[in-house]
């Protein structure tokens, strides 16, 4: 309502979050309650952690909890349709090549008419052969990269995979 149709990301003070106990459960700090509240609010699209050095310090296992419980999978930068509402075209010439370093997936960047339509990153998804490709499942993201290739994980060829690459601008 008050974010003027813009993405809303709230700030989390890491040290204050771990310094005080959760009023509903004094055996833990406030991160679980804050994450539950944040995720219950449909207008909040994420959070930023302040200050960044505290992430490395990991007070109260804050970083570990984020990595293991709350942010296990990569996140994509949200779209900003108020700035640019046209997605880049699809990548071209997706091809896997065996190299001395193992399998590498190559693709060609899509052509862009304007700078705003130019692809700057690519998301590589991996699905088991025959599995329906669900691009909303972040657990299927293998990489987010600026390169137009990626060395693929190889697991002795026992499981066959299909890869999907999407472009981001």
What is the role of each PLM region?
Residues 110-136, 160:
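Solvent-exposed loop/turn segments flanking beta-strands in beta-repeat/beta-sandwich domains
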Residues 1-82:
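Substrate-binding cleft of secreted/luminal carbohydrate-active enzymes
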Residues 61-117, 157, 169:
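Pro/Thr/Ser/Gly-rich low-complexity, intrinsically disordered linker/stalk tracts
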Residues 140-146:
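Short beta-strand segments within Ig-like beta-sandwich modules, predominantly Fibronectin type-III
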Residues 104, 121-123, 164:
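Conserved beta-strand and immediately adjacent loop positions that scaffold enzyme active sites
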Residues 21-22, 135-138:
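Short acidic, glycine/proline-rich loop/turn micro-motifs
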Residues 2-5, 40-43, 98-99, 116-118, ...:
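A structural signal for short secondary-structure junctions
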Residues 151-169:
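Beta-strand-rich modules
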């Amino acid at each position: 309502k008050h974010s003027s149709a813009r993405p809303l990301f709230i700030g989390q003070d890491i040290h204050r979050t771990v310094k005080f106990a959760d009023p509903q459960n004094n055996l833990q700090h406030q991160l679980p309650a804050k994450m539950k509240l944040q995720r219950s609010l449909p207008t909040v699209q994420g959070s930023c952690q302040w200050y960044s050095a505290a992430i490395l310090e990991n007070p109260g296992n804050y970083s570990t909890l984020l990595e293991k419980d709350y942010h296990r999978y990569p996140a994509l930068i949200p779209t900003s349709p108020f700035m640019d509402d046209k997605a880049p075209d699809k990548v071209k010439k997706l091809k896997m090549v065996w190299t001395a370093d193992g399998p590498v997936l190559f693709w060609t960047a899509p052509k862009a008419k304007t700078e705003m339509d130019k692809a700057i990153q690519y998301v590589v998804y991996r699905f088991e052969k025959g599995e329906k490709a669900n691009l909303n499942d972040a657990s299927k993201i293998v990489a987010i990269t600026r390169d137009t290739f990626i060395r693929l994980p190889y697991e002795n060829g026992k499981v066959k995979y299909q890869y999907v690459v999407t472009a981001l601008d």
